[in-house]
A protein has these predicted regions:
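Well-ordered beta-sheet/strand-loop patches within structured domains
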Residues: 1-215
Length: 215
């Protein structure tokens, strides 16, 4: 739950996610093909059943039809980083809105979306066919990539060079780099590839937790 956010918008988000998942679940991405998040989902309109949900804009919250679909693009991006698939287009928010409390993934590991300008596009440069499975579970948004051949490698995402940089105007920029590590099935590191460089204006005190402890 998010502080100061209308919980009806959160409930509406679940409806929006179910509609979008229905458009993506079962997608086959064959060798040489590229998928576009927005091409597959289409414009999220009230006529299609989408409801007002929360979106982030310029570091703040507002309600918009189809709001909440960034949660799905975040999941798909994170899933894809754990495969050999190629991310062709990905964007992230220019603002870091949430402190790290309860964070389970590195900062900057999501993919924001805004129809029709900010898309998430993924290309299959392998010789195998991939299938996307996504759904709204009982408590979580769930997803996986399935592949037509037995996997010969596994993947992990690690964070490097994480910094909170003070700026001349009094605020902070949060920076990090994400790398995809490729291992063979015996656990030997085969490669480490840069996949994202993130910079975002922080919308909270970078020393929030320390301040609370001192208080």
């Amino acid at each position: 739950k998010l502080k100061d956010v209308d919980m009806q918008l959160q409930r509406n988000k679940v409806t929006n996610l179910r509609l979008a998942c229905a458009r993506l679940d079962g997608l086959l991405l064959r060798p040489g093909e590229t998928m576009s998040y927005w091409y597959l989902i289409g414009k999220p309109t009230a006529g299609k059943g989408y409801l007002p949900g929360m979106i982030l804009r310029n570091g703040g919250y507002l309600a918009a039809t189809g709001g909440g679909l960034c949660q799905l693009s975040n999941l798909i991006y994170w899933m894809t980083l754990h495969t050999p698939l190629t991310v062709v287009e990905r964007h992230r928010h220019g603002y870091d809105v949430f402190p790290d409390a309860n964070r389970t993934q590195p900062f900057g590991s999501g993919a924001t979306c805004f129809y029709p300008y900010l898309d998430l596009m993924i290309r299959n440069d392998t010789q195998d066919t991939y299938q996307m499975r996504v759904r709204v579970g009982k408590t979580d948004l769930e997803g996986e990539w399935r592949v037509s051949a037995e996997p010969t490698e596994r993947y992990a995402v690690v964070e490097r060079n994480h910094e909170m940089r003070a700026q001349y105007w009094g605020g902070y920029i949060r920076h990090n780099e994400l790398y995809r590590q490729t291992f063979d099935l015996q656990g030997n590191l085969l490669a480490e590839t840069l996949v994202a460089v993130n910079d975002a204006v922080m919308m909270y005190s970078p020393y929030l937790e320390e301040s609370k402890k001192e208080g």
